[in-house]
Amino acid sequence: MKLKKIIPAFPLLSTVAVGLWLTPTQASADAADTMVDISGKKVLVGYWHNWASKGRDGYKQGTSASLNLSEVNQAYNVVPVSFMKSDGTTRIPTFKPYNQTDTAFRQEVAQLNSQGRAVLLALGGADAHIQLVKGDEQAFANEIIRQVETYGFDGLDIDLEQLAITAGDNQTVIPATLKIVKDHYRAQGKNFIITMAPEFPYLKPGAAYETYITSLNGYYDYIAPQLYNQGGDGVWVDEIMTWVAQSNDALKYEFLYYMSDSLIHGTRGYLQIPNDKLVLGLPANRDAAGSGYVVEATPVAKTFDQLAKDGNPIRGLMTWSANWDVGQDVNGKSYNNEFATRYSNLVK
């Protein structure tokens, strides 16, 4: 299949040059040509694994499912593909489908796009060390655009963790790169989606994600804090005179509500994320994360309801991951789309 546009082999010279050097071909259009616009829409976000399950890969020795992208539960209207990272031959992160040709994978993306579902490229992940340096902006922008034109991605999710968040010049290079890409597609009347999924302790003033958020203000579409795998970290709440920890199942509603309220207003020691750009990140089940799983659906539904009553309805929910949502526990019992089934009604 021919691509929508041809990306030159030589570096583009400026932000303006991006539009000038890309020459349209006469390729027949497919649904992957459509850049799905999620502006103003509620989202249920489910990450997709770009690798085969090896079995017993869960925190409780369960097994994640191996899925084609097109097999992701249709309740997930935003599907980040995990992950874009360095292939070891260059600093510039890249992506390749693990089990399909470029043409076949593009057809998978096209199927989701035809259903009005956005497919993002997730940058990083827990085991990816990305270290860009000043001057990489244009080369990285070129690669992202090449990925979009090759596979039909609708945007990019910043999913940097650990040392990769601040490595090299990432905090300045990545936002500058994404502005180039977003402006390039804006010139075509399209919305290149930019999202982030930081672990929530990095959302404090002076913490590692502050630069990304402030630099991309006006450019990002939503932020989905990972409210899991952080043990006893949490938030002090004066109103109830209690430290509310992420790992405290007895106070799960209080954690979800007050963490959301803190982020919406930029209080209790956290940065501000507008309510219409806030997506809560939760694990699909106990195998998907070491802590943070919500045992019953009630605390999540109650949080959504109370925030709406406060006049601060939030954007939606995110989970790690769509593959885990249809995985199995250690005894071989299917998780049977528990997350999608429980929460899809909250984003309608």
UniProtKB/Swiss-Prot annotation:
It catalyses: Random endo-hydrolysis of N-acetyl-beta-D-glucosaminide (1->4)-beta-linkages in chitin and chitodextrins. The active site is at E161 (proton donor). Keywords: Carbohydrate metabolism, Chitin degradation, Glycosidase, Hydrolase, Polysaccharide degradation, Secreted, Signal. It comes from the Bacteria. The keyword Secreted applies. Pathway: Glycan degradation; chitin degradation. Gene3D superfamilies: Glycosidases. Its EC number is 3.2.1.14. One of its GO terms (cellular component) is extracellular region. The keyword rRNA-binding does not apply. It is found in: Secreted. One of its GO terms (biological process) is polysaccharide catabolic process. Pfam families: Glyco_hydro_18. GO terms for molecular function: chitin binding; chitinase activity; endochitinase activity. Residues 1-29 form the signal peptide. Residues 42-348 form the GH18 domain. It is an enzyme of class 3 (hydrolase). Disulfide bonds: none annotated. Belongs to the glycosyl hydrolase 18 family. Involved in chitin degradation. Catalyzes the cleavage of glycosidic linkages in chitooligosaccharides and in alpha- and beta-chitin. Its activity on chitooligosaccharides increases considerably with degrees of polymerization (the initial rate of hydrolysis for GlcNAc5 is about 130-fold higher than that for GlcNAc3). This is Chitinase. It comes from Enterococcus faecalis (strain ATCC 700802 / V583).
